[in-house]
Amino acid sequence: MNRRDMLKTVSAAIAGTSLLGMEALASNPHAGTSPAKKALIIGAHPDDPETGCGGTMLVLEKAGYEVVSVYMTKGEAGIPGKTHEESSAIRVAEATKASEMLGARPIFMTQIDGSTEINKERYVEMRELIAAEKPDVVFTHWPIDSHADHRVCSSLVYDAWRR
């Protein structure tokens, strides 16, 4: 099963399921009675936020959080046999649909799949995004992930969040 098929299967299963013993949060009677909190989920590629913490995103959304799904790239190199333009069009459409299913607002950044970079400009871009969104909680990749783009994303997010 490829990631695309897995995401479809998992999304269907999540729709009617509470996850990780988070029933109390998901059924929060105070949701909507206080200022909304915001969760920012930042992944390197389309599908990373959903496959990494889609269940948590859904539970937070049901608890009244504003959930924002940030994609550092548009998945340009994500589909073998497709051009970067074809692949990014498909992956952006999939991520947009997944965000809709999870009650999240998608944001697409400007890095290129497979060629992500850490430099002063990229730190500024991430810091400005986080400052503009003003999240209460941020989720991202594990810093020692096997995928280079995931490690870049984690480093940028961690350093931007600390400042």
Residue ranges and their predicted role:
Residues A148-W161:
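Short Gly/Thr/Asp-enriched flexible loops that form oxyanion-binding sites at enzyme active sites
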Residues L129-I130, K134-I144:
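Proline-aspartate-enriched helix->loop->beta-strand connector
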Residues H45, H141, H147:
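Histidine-centered divalent metal-coordination motifs
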Residues R3-L19, A26-E133, R162-R163:
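Active-site rim/loop-helix segments in enzyme catalytic domains that contact anionic ligands
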Residues E117, S146-A148:
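Short, well-ordered, mixed-charge alpha-helical segments that flank or form enzyme active sites
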